[in-house]
Amino acid sequence: MRGNNLFKTAALSAVVGTLALAILMNSSKTVRASQDENADQNGESLIQRGFDVTPVPLNLEGKNRALVGLGSYIVNVVGDCNGCHSAGPATEFASGGNPYFRSPIFTGTKVVNTATYLAGGRDFGPVGSVLHLYSRNLTPNNTGLPVGGRTYEQFVEIMRHGTDLDHIHPNCTAPDTPANCFLPPFNGDLLQVMRWPSFQNMTDHQLQAIYEYLSAIPCNPGPAIAGAPYLQNTCEK
């Protein structure tokens, strides 16, 4: 009898152990599935969404596809870079494609105006009596480098530190300082409108992705604005 009880106890223990192992394995699979899903949310699905939403044809020759797709996602979905780096709200969207309007002016489908896409020229001025701040042209020039020919190292300097490499608006320091200078407390060495204090917290991988995407979009000559020749790109090679 005692042996029989021992056998039953051992059998019950084996069943309980098997169930516990099964539960543990199933839980592990669930965790792995959740981790895989989270990884995908930061991987291929975002890359594909980036390709889905880009409004312009892309030159992928010599480019890293994954970086281009992720860069498009950051630029077009997360950052809404075109909201500032186009000529302004009036021309940001194509005719009939402005989602802020109502029917029948808005036809129901958002359509970005490719003629002004990321080409800069939005006026954020005036500051004071004469100073106008214009968003920069982010498209590549005829060198193939974005932001009007910036190297990746220069791009990182802009994004991490807000450095205005064009030095468009110097600090007002002397009577002969040009009229487009910055009065204190503003620092003319830095970009004053761009949200670089937020962008500087991006990872190196994210900055690489943005740069790769901007390298893949078409060159846009940019708007012709008096006193702002720095907005224009040379597209002809």
Give the ranges of each region predicted by the language model.
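A cross-kingdom feature marking solvent-exposed beta-strand/loop segments within repeated
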Residues: 178-201
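Electron-transfer interface patches adjacent to heme c in soluble/periplasmic c-type cytochromes
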Residues: 79, 100-160, 164-168, 197-207
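The canonical Cys-X-X-Cys-His
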Residues: 71, 78-89, 155, 210-214
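Bacterial N-terminal signal peptides that target proteins for export
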Residues: 2-14
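Electrostatic cytochrome c docking/interface patches
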Residues: 46-76
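Bacterial N-terminal signal peptides
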Residues: 13-22
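Surface-exposed intrinsically disordered loops and tails
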Residues: 43, 49-52, 91, 95-127, ...
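Ser/Thr/Pro/Gly-rich low-complexity linker/stalk segments immediately outside membranes or between
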Residues: 28-37
